[in-house]
């Protein structure tokens, strides 16, 4: 049995938690290790028993962690674990953003690569980035990886000169789903724009337009459900703010759902929706995959890049241009055609191609 270290955004974010679920369930005979906070005791929905969550909460671990930080070697526990395992799978979406933590993130990955040797990157997009130096630094890093599979063509084009670079549609397109259910509510995934760099100035317009859309949907005879994908990124705060803007007499038509680690429950909530208004990236992907009409509100290029890859010709808005966020535009959108979804699911499987080969090798 091979043993693999998972590097993921372990913050009880539904999209990233689904990556972990899909990885563990696909490779039932592989033992996976994930460093996470104690909140991950609440993670539910992985149908296999092959994930060991390592918590940095014992006294000895805290001492080691502090020593590592003191000598400029943060995440030393991760390094030591990578050294004793068969490989590292870095699975996630926006995991290569140039920001104040870029240098430290790169050092950690470089050490993981040196210790873990067999390093796989699945489901990612590259950027946003500001400097060619950042891109060149990762060009050299990717060259040493066992496999790199991006989730959009834009990122692939940046590094396609490397033989080990591939791309497919988002991994979540290939998630095995329950039978489609026609629901009676419109599901909104809502974010707090001010929690993201560069969007605090549009927050008032964003909430006002969501309020108007909510009231118009209620007026049309449908109920509404506000859904949080990640408490840590202030989705719940955003929902409470929007609810406070809506007249109390309309609250009986509105419910809310806060994701706190139960993936199957969250997927059922999404599956029971009539349609989806998606600011969250994976609300958009899951809405598409569940054959729902989706109205995307793009907060980054990663969303518009994926829409372009899907040749999406329907209505959507962006945080940079909210003019199209209206009931008239929303009600025009339809579910994606079945042939596009089948192709997207097949493309999503591509991310696992090289990892399949590696984990199925004898020895």
Regions flagged by a language model, labelled:
Residues 1-363:
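Active-site anion-handling motifs in enzyme catalytic cores
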């Amino acid at each position: 049995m091979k043993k693999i270290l998972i590097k993921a955004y372990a913050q009880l974010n539904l999209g990233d938690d689904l990556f972990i679920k899909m990885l563990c369930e696909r490779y039932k005979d592989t033992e996976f290790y994930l460093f996470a906070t104690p909140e991950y005791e609440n993670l539910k929905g992985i149908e296999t028993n092959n994930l060991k969550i390592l918590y940095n909460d014992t006294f000895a671990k805290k001492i080691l962690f502090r020593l590592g930080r003191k000598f400029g070697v943060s995440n030393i526990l991760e390094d030591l674990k990578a050294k004793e395992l068969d490989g590292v799978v870095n699975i996630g979406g926006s995991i290569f953003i140039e920001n104040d933590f870029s240098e430290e993130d790169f050092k950690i990955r470089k050490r993981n690569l040196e210790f873990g040797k067999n390093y796989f990157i699945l489901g990612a997009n590259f950027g946003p980035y500001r400097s060619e130096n950042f891109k060149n630094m990762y060009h050299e890093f990717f060259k040493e990886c066992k496999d790199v599979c991006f989730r959009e063509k834009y990122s692939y084009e940046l590094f396609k000169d490397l033989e080990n670079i591939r791309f497919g549609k988002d991994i979540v397109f290939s998630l095995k789903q329950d039978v489609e259910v026609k629901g009676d509510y419109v599901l909104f995934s809502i974010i707090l724009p001010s929690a993201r760099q560069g969007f605090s100035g549009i927050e008032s317009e964003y909430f006002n337009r969501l309020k108007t859309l909510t009231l118009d949907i209620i007026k049309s005879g449908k109920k509404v459900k506000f859904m949080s994908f990640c408490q840590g990124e202030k989705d719940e705060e955003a929902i409470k703010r929007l609810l406070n803007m809506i007249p109390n007499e309309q609250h009986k038509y509105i419910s809310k759902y806060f994701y706190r680690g139960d993936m199957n429950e969250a997927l059922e909530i999404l599956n029971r929706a009539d349609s989806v208004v998606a600011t969250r990236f994976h609300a958009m992907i899951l809405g598409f995959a569940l054959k729902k009409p989706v109205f995307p509100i793009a907060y980054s290029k990663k969303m518009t890049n994926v829409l372009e890859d899907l040749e999406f010709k329907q209505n959507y808005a962006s945080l940079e241009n909210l003019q199209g966020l209206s009931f008239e535009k929303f009600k025009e959108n339809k579910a994606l055609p079945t042939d596009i979804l089948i192709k997207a699911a097949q493309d999503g499987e591509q991310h696992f191609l090289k990892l399949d080969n590696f984990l199925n090798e004898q020895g």
